[in-house]
Swiss-Prot record:
Functional summary from the UniProt entry: An essential GTPase that binds both GDP and GTP, with rapid nucleotide exchange. Plays a role in 16S rRNA processing and 30S ribosomal subunit biogenesis and possibly also in cell cycle regulation and energy metabolism.
PROSITE patterns named among the record's database cross-references: G_ERA (PS51713), KH_TYPE_2 (PS50823)
Name used for this protein in its record: GTPase Era
Gene (UniProt): era
UniProt superkingdom: Bacteria
Protein keywords: Cell membrane, Cytoplasm, GTP-binding, Membrane, Nucleotide-binding, Ribosome biogenesis, RNA-binding, rRNA-binding
Cell membrane is among the record's keywords: yes
Organism: Clostridium perfringens (strain SM101 / Type A)
GO cellular component: cytosol; plasma membrane
Region of interest: G3: 58-61
Binding annotation for GTP: 11-18, 58-62, 120-123
The protein's assembly and partners: Monomer.
NCBIfam families registered for this protein in UniProt: era, PRK00089.1, small_GTP
Classification lineage: Bacteria, Bacillati, Bacillota, Clostridia, Eubacteriales
Gene Ontology molecular functions: GTP binding; GTPase activity; ribosomal small subunit binding; small ribosomal subunit rRNA binding
Residue ranges constituting the KH type-2 domain according to the UniProt record: 201-278
Length: 296
């Protein structure tokens, strides 16, 4: 019997949703950073086994929005819960169930798919705190399963995969065996550049940036020539992004090029232009140009 289905991964910002997706896939498709609210779009990735096919939706973290981009991210995450076959709800060890987790649980009550509670980052907590957290969440919702894991250390993730197959319905193979994502290459390129910016910039700047791929061409020798706009909200941020003697921008470019060459399996030449677009996160038309469609 072949099983298949759509699986959404939900949770508060920075609980490890993208790390888990990347671990299960064995490919780096979702942007990973230690800063919250890193994922902005629902990334659809496909994992095919001998008797199953899972289509993952890696959502932005659900949080209280502060601008139109935040509204997009929350709408995108809550919409992903609807019409799926299985939900993975990620959280981390805690002393009490917080407001963010309770808000997600309320959204889960409106759908019929089974929900597996995944307690991530257990390697960073004591066994007593892990047990207490599982008990706390068991009182909040009737989960189909509850499982502690460490996505970073790949602890207990094989067991999680078995549980996911268990709860998948019988179904067809939606995508070819060798297809691992439905997003375009240009989107992944933009996400890689944004990840490197996130890792190299200070606290205030990162979430005020966006990346727009202006050009992506492959020459006769197979080398990619890529030009991107790195968009920020303030002129002062532009100076921070460029850095003294251009060093910060050079570091973003060099680390992005290395990752892009791994992803594209080809040589890459990348040029990054820093542009200021004041309050772009509250500009609906610009947000849509940048690919954020789910604004209400």
């Amino acid at each position: 019997m072949f099983k298949s289905g759509f699986i959404t991964i939900v949770g508060r910002p920075n609980v490890g949703k993208s790390t888990l997706t990347n671990l299960l896939m064995g490919e780096k498709l979702s942007i990973v950073s230690n800063k919250p609210q890193t994922t902005r779009n629902n990334i659809q990735t496909i994992l095919t086994g001998d008797d199953y096919q899972m289509i993952f939706v890696d959502t932005p973290g659900i949080h209280k929005p502060k601008h139109k981009l935040g509204e997009y991210m929350v709408n995108s995450a809550t919409d992903s819960i609807k019409d799926v076959d299985l939900v993975l709800f990620l959280s981390n060890p805690c002393e009490e169930v917080g407001r963010g987790d309770k808000f997600i649980i309320e959204q889960l009550k409106n759908q019929k798919a089974p929900v597996i509670f995944v307690l991530n980052k257990v390697d960073e907590s004591s066994p007593e705190k892990v047990a207490k957290t599982l008990e706390l969440f068991s009182k909040e919702y009737d989960f189909a399963e509850m499982i502690p894991i460490s996505a970073m250390k790949a602890k207990n993730t094989d067991k999680l995969l078995e549980l996911m197959v268990k709860y998948l319905p019988e179904g067809p193979k939606y995508y070819p065996d060798d297809m691992i994502t439905d997003v375009q290459e240009r989107f992944v390129v933009a996400e890689i550049v944004r990840e490197k910016a996130l890792k190299n910039l200070s606290q205030e700047v990162p979430h005020g940036i966006a990346v727009d791929v202006i050009q992506m061409k492959q020459d006769d020798n197979g080398k990619y020539n890529i030009e991107v706009d790195l968009i920020c909200e303030k002129a002062s941020h532009k100076g921070i992004i460029i850095g003294k003697n251009g060093q910060t921008l050079k570091k973003i470019g060099s680390t992005a090029r290395y990752e892009l060459e791994r992803f594209l399996r080809a040589k890459v030449n990348i040029k990054i232009w820093v542009k200021v677009r004041k309050e772009w996160r509250d500009n609906t038309s610009l947000l849509k140009e940048l690919g954020y469609k789910k604004l209400k």
